Amino acid sequence: MFSDVVILAGGFGERLWPASSTENPKQFMTVTDNVSFLQTAVLRALAIKPKGKIVIVTRKDIYTTVALHCKELLARLSEDDQKKIKEDLYILPETEPKQTTAPIILACHFLNKIDSSFEHLVLVLTSDHIITPMERFVSDCNKASIAAKEGKFLCFAIPPVEPATGYGYIKTGMPLNDDGSVFEIESFVEKPDLETATAYLASGNYWWNSGMFGFTCKTLIEELKKHQNDAYSAFEKVPDMAAPVFEYAEGIKFVSEWPAMDEAYSKVPVIAIDKSVAEKTDIACAVRSSFNWDDIGSWDAFEKLFDHNIGKTVEVECKDNFIYSDIPVALCGIEGVVVVIKNGRALIMKKGKSSLVRDVVKQMKNSNV
């Protein structure tokens, strides 16, 4: 199984505005069982029982909120898991957001720096997705870790359930193991149009790219050197520089000072790990995941998580609406809308129009609304 887990928690989550915003992004939103997206990611990390560390890489301006969510999760955990959080979970604040390559390579150097006694086998998780059931996730991670330990760059491929145009796709080739769960990757495909996505769905060998990965730190560093040398060279001096300094926020360890990171982040390019490594390497492979997955990237997706409104609501002569509000809301004679009122802001959206939310946010910023 993977020895360490890296959770990427630096996103902004504008597609779920106004509940998600720059200062209070999607990963902090409450979902099922009254836990946040971030907390469910930590639960997944604990479920694979890593012998090493759990590292949450996040933005410098929200690391204290990350710590608070980790602290609040403790009451739900067993004694062993509480101990794991207190002893082996670290928050690593980025000096500035720089897509996914920078935080991932930073986390690998961090793991090597604080414990060089073994080869770190790393699972990279997102902080804002829904994955069920946990048992299948753990089983798939075990299969993935075997391939990653053998020197592969492992991607988690999700079986598509609809011709989605909002995801990148992975085209898989021949199986690489006996049970047919791990496959070679023939190509990565950008977000397609509807006609192309429909053809992908019918073909049976195109899968959604989940944004979750597995590899050894050694493998990742070597592949960056080959395929994205400017990212590799930005961190080249980190192993020889001083170790990070730790402090506590809400009883959770975080890196308060690490000059090596500051220097590296001033040089590293802004690029996704998909572009820097996954699409270029010849050692990429994919686990065809058996678990259910949803990135909940829109209000249309989010409202499907619930069979009821969230907040104090009254509806008269209404149907097929979803309300998510922190103040009382009343609707009269309304049909097929999503109403979101959070953080002093409101969104009223016709169902099926989630793709317009980012445009709204952009226009509001430009208009200084």
List the predicted regions and their residue ranges.
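Left-handed beta-helix
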Residues: 1, 219-369
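Conserved N-terminal catalytic core of the sugar/cofactor nucleotidyltransferase
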Residues: 1-7, 15-22, 30-126, 132-135, ...
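Short beta-strand segments
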Residues: 7-9, 57, 123-126, 155-159, ...
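Conserved active-site and cofactor/substrate-binding residues in soluble primary-metabolism enzymes
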Residues: 23, 33-36, 61, 99-102, ...
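Short loop-to-beta-strand entry elements in the cores of soluble alpha/beta enzymes
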Residues: 52-54, 204-216
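Conserved beta-loop-beta/alpha segment of the NTase-like Rossmann-fold superfamily
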Residues: 85-175, 214, 222-228
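A residue-level structural signature of the nucleotidyltransferase/glycosyltransferase Rossmann-like core
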Residues: 122, 186, 205, 212-213, ...
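A short, charged helix-loop
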Residues: 173-207, 255
